[in-house]
Amino acid sequence: MSNSLGKLFQITSFGESHGDCVGVVIDGVPAGLAINVDEIQIEVDKRKSGAKAHTTPRREDDRIEIFSGIFNNFTTGAPICLVIWNKNIDSSEYERTRSKIRPGHADFTGFMKYGGFNDYRGGGRFSGRITAGHVMAGAIARKLISTIGIEVIGYTAELGGITAKLPKHKDIRQNISQSDVNCPDLAASKQMVALIQQAAEEGDSLGGVVECIGLNLPVGLGEPVFDTLEGELAKAIFAIPAVKGVEFGAGFGASRLRGSKNNDPFNIQSDQIRTTSNNCGGILGGISDGMPLHVRVAVKPTPSISLSQPTVNLDTMTNTSLEIRGRHDTCIVPRAVSVVEAMTCIVLADLALRAGIIPRVIKQ
Amino acid sequence: MSNSLGKLFQITSFGESHGDCVGVVIDGVPAGLAINVDEIQIEVDKRKSGAKAHTTPRREDDRIEIFSGIFNNFTTGAPICLVIWNKNIDSSEYERTRSKIRPGHADFTGFMKYGGFNDYRGGGRFSGRITAGHVMAGAIARKLISTIGIEVIGYTAELGGITAKLPKHKDIRQNISQSDVNCPDLAASKQMVALIQQAAEEGDSLGGVVECIGLNLPVGLGEPVFDTLEGELAKAIFAIPAVKGVEFGAGFGASRLRGSKNNDPFNIQSDQIRTTSNNCGGILGGISDGMPLHVRVAVKPTPSISLSQPTVNLDTMTNTSLEIRGRHDTCIVPRAVSVVEAMTCIVLADLALRAGIIPRVIKQ
Amino acid sequence: MSNSLGKLFQITSFGESHGDCVGVVIDGVPAGLAINVDEIQIEVDKRKSGAKAHTTPRREDDRIEIFSGIFNNFTTGAPICLVIWNKNIDSSEYERTRSKIRPGHADFTGFMKYGGFNDYRGGGRFSGRITAGHVMAGAIARKLISTIGIEVIGYTAELGGITAKLPKHKDIRQNISQSDVNCPDLAASKQMVALIQQAAEEGDSLGGVVECIGLNLPVGLGEPVFDTLEGELAKAIFAIPAVKGVEFGAGFGASRLRGSKNNDPFNIQSDQIRTTSNNCGGILGGISDGMPLHVRVAVKPTPSISLSQPTVNLDTMTNTSLEIRGRHDTCIVPRAVSVVEAMTCIVLADLALRAGIIPRVIKQ
Amino acid sequence: MSNSLGKLFQITSFGESHGDCVGVVIDGVPAGLAINVDEIQIEVDKRKSGAKAHTTPRREDDRIEIFSGIFNNFTTGAPICLVIWNKNIDSSEYERTRSKIRPGHADFTGFMKYGGFNDYRGGGRFSGRITAGHVMAGAIARKLISTIGIEVIGYTAELGGITAKLPKHKDIRQNISQSDVNCPDLAASKQMVALIQQAAEEGDSLGGVVECIGLNLPVGLGEPVFDTLEGELAKAIFAIPAVKGVEFGAGFGASRLRGSKNNDPFNIQSDQIRTTSNNCGGILGGISDGMPLHVRVAVKPTPSISLSQPTVNLDTMTNTSLEIRGRHDTCIVPRAVSVVEAMTCIVLADLALRAGIIPRVIKQ
């Protein structure tokens, strides 16, 4: 296992789905950053199931607790430990089906890698619930990068094959609260909701694409040749369970363009060098170029479905089938939005510190 | 800058396009691995321009030199330094157009990040030539993971929009040497070659998609939650200039499937647990599951084109236009194949060491 | 701040002296290690003030809590979070003298480095209490290295200038529980206790030397050229507040010997290569040589004394004097023994994993 | 093996004593630092044997070569690779005695750890010659920290038991060039030279103590709780072969002082907070306090002596004896001075970058 991420803004994740808690330690946060517990709670609530229709109906009362690193509402320079307690855990279903490895989940690989000692309840360490820790860390990162003006906003760009129209930045901010699936194209949003309803009734699940945008990035974030802005973001985002693809700007589409179309011409805008298009997604040579950062993330359909699936019984080493009971998100894409945002904030915070753009003490 | 990659199998890259050399130090290679200089040379030759038609016609006589870490044809446990000298460098064109930042290149971001001190000749540290170092390191990694049976093969899956038929593993090995563009679908290969010819005549360039496959991986490679197999591979592959997207298995396509179609059912094959499909690309929960690893890589069209492009003159801060002279690859996708293979080998070597699957001393 | 230590066995420390808690996350512990909460509690109790005479009389009721990473009494491969709550904290004295920087403490450097945002209560992050976290992590490390037979024992070798006779290993284990100062030379122990009594009455404090011994180390721990066994141990041990010197084997004494006396001759003992003396402290070329590891640690006298000291008032920037009230250890050397042991166990665990000597799954 | 050191100013060492070369890659050097090859050469020459009497008489013609990272005499932000070629190597003596492990050397531990594959010629990777790479990196670090006014000076404080009088800083700079053993106390220097002569005639060797001083350090270098200034320096210095002890300020002597004597009182000097004594060696809480840094390093006597020593024959696994022929330094302490200085510069450069005190681009 390797549960730390980042070089100067470094997060260390701990906890399990059905253990005592999910938590994170954030090291390297500059001293003097004003932090209010509610600012972190808001981000965690965004991710929370039950916040909106059509995700897990069980109610998670996720109150965050600050254990260290914040004193008189300012960061101290010391590591910040944040925890959410797990409550009302019922592991009986996992005990019942324990020997049957769930397709699309980490039951098999986890069992093999950890010699059967891994906590299998609720997926244990592989559960999407672990990302609550990422989101807490992301809230601190978001606050930190806001001191240099960076804003990070994400949305559901595609769900079950339904594609949202490309939104303007202000539409994302305005419309997203009106959508049950975090999609600013409200017409598409309605279709997505209907499709989730239908898939849920069929006992099946859906995937989609999250797009995340970073605004007001300075030129210079990214540490080539290995710690590129793309590479660091991709690594962080692949830590979100169910992510199977990451692309920047025109991405896979760029591979079908000619150079004359794909190259973003430079020109001078308000005395600054900008590009007139943004196929590169705000990144050239692995370094932010001052244009908006664009990253798109492919999320596979939720592997937990109630339809019967062929699988193997680990105890008897025989073929069998499995029906997963209980309530699971039909589509996690809307919830993944806040996690993709969090990972983006975390990486930008780390790279801004590494580039020397954010100082070691924040002076308000 | 950050020029080291990997935790136990760690490579450190150095050199510039028009400097003295391109080199790499590889630390953490177990002692006792038999290494012949020719094995490394073969990989470098694969990447070399001029090896096949339609890539850069200039001839690079890239003889690798071993500076350290290998004694009596075996690794010693000490760091291995490998170097290729740069020869017959002509930087006059770069001097001529120095103040005009090339669209699609790192000229602008490099200038800004390094305060104008960066070596701009031939793209300096951002040049594709730097990947010759990655390929040397990849050759060592390839030899190391072959001791546990892993094989890594890549090919051109798509070029300028032309898609190769999905090949069988043996076809990749057999056909690729007959293709000028590293495409085992020889019919598609012919079309790709013709398209390159045409784009070259038009002064334009093409992109494409590289697919890379890992065979015979043990179950257990990948260190979640942050150092997942996907995340580590993606980060390494984004260190290749021009890569704008990475996906695993069904990738972005998976986001449009239902769970019942995307989940790979388990069954028992020859007393081993395998899946009957491989939409997950051989990775579950960030850990290899024993099925073939599948990664697909989007490569943007070469940014160096001879068509005129709008850009900015850094010295005068005025809008201008640029025509890039000299000979450049119309499409780097065929050459990128060996680099994607190299990065894959490097990551697998690191993760196999981290999983304790490769010992610290190799005993033949 | 940098609060993580280790490469494969990695600990991340958090918490403050007068905050909610002191805690540690331990990542990289192999799955399958049997862990009982009492085993960790025993180590924490050893460090605890009040356990023996002449250290801080205040009673710390330090019950450890396991938050993650242990399931059914075995490690799971997931990160282990351990916490001790801070109770009955009275920060009034620190509030009273806040502006007067305490000589010998980190008040001044902490204030300067963190822009005055650091938690000054009880020394905050610089307090010796933070080492309770190190000791919890050390307990896990101790259990892990015991699986390959390694034993780590420490003792007070010198206190206030009184030197203990060099003990036999079995005497350390037997006598130490009879000494109030963790000194196996019981005659010297009595003198040390008397000296502490005297210094306490005078409002002054004492320092000393801790010796720590590692038994049954395999040959091969240490990763030169930079991560030597000496270097890794020294770095870890200097994380203990008040440590000002570290030496191995004959140490500074070796610098006054001739080579013919200092070199440890090899010979064959029970079919194994051993040295007939151990001036090198069990380390050659930065790597364990199979002989007992010997490290000696200089601990400065407790900086908190009740005698009046000249200092500066930060608010007024004027010279002033300070008398520190409250109860403080007259000598922390006896308590430092368990912390030095803990750091030694942590480093040996990390290096044993790095050398591939401890597997990724422990099979009992 | 682990051959990289540092987090932001990161050096990677390679090469062997009797291989092609000794080299180093330095990553993370800010762009815009003026570097002249002669500045590096001067430092390497200081370390060079033959530069002064009584060290190895063989003449090393160590001309450094810059392979990358410097363009038009300024650093570019790219990794800097520096190399010294090994010339006139005669390995015959090592071939002759190969099976006899040399007491006090790493022959035994190296053989065991690397399964016999290690390059044994001249000690291979464990040779003191490797420190030539450290010194090259140290020259770059020295130049970098000079941009914020830091000066690092070292000297022979003790040799074979002869102790130099504590020098004033200006005496170190002035007198050291007049001493054949880098000792500014010229009377002691004469005695040391005579003692070396005598030990050489007896076929024996001597050790000693190097003191290194850092002047004009800003307050704030050091990243507790684990990456303390003491810990980072100690780790780096223990990478020098033959070092067996490291202490700061009063060091082991502090352990025998009372708190009232050891605490350094604060007062205001020229509007700045300073201490009136410096028992802490310029470090409080693991962070520089603005006073001179004092570190003392115990160097064991050279293990290579011409007197006969009992040892073991690895091939036959029998007891035997060994006489080491050839010319070896009777005492390496004078040469170690420049290496201790180099390691100190390297650590200070890294910590100054980590503290945000040195910017990412140097503007002259």
From Swiss-Prot, chains A, B, C, D:
The keyword NADP applies. GO terms for cellular component: cytosol. Its cofactor is FMNH2. PROSITE patterns: CHORISMATE_SYNTHASE_1, CHORISMATE_SYNTHASE_2. The keyword 4Fe-4S does not apply. FMN binds at R125, F126, S127, G285, K300, P301, T302, P303, S304, R327. GO terms for biological process: amino acid biosynthetic process; aromatic amino acid family biosynthetic process; chorismate biosynthetic process. NADP(+) binds at R47. It comes from the Bacteria. It is an enzyme of class 4 (lyase). Reduced FMN (FMNH(2)). It holds the Pfam family Chorismate_synt. Pathway: Metabolic intermediate biosynthesis; chorismate biosynthesis; chorismate from D-erythrose 4-phosphate and phosphoenolpyruvate: step 7/7. GO terms for molecular function: chorismate synthase activity; FMN binding. Its EC number is 4.2.3.5. Belongs to the chorismate synthase family. This reaction introduces a second double bond into the aromatic ring system. Homotetramer. HAMAP family: Chorismate_synth (MF_00300). This is Chorismate synthase.
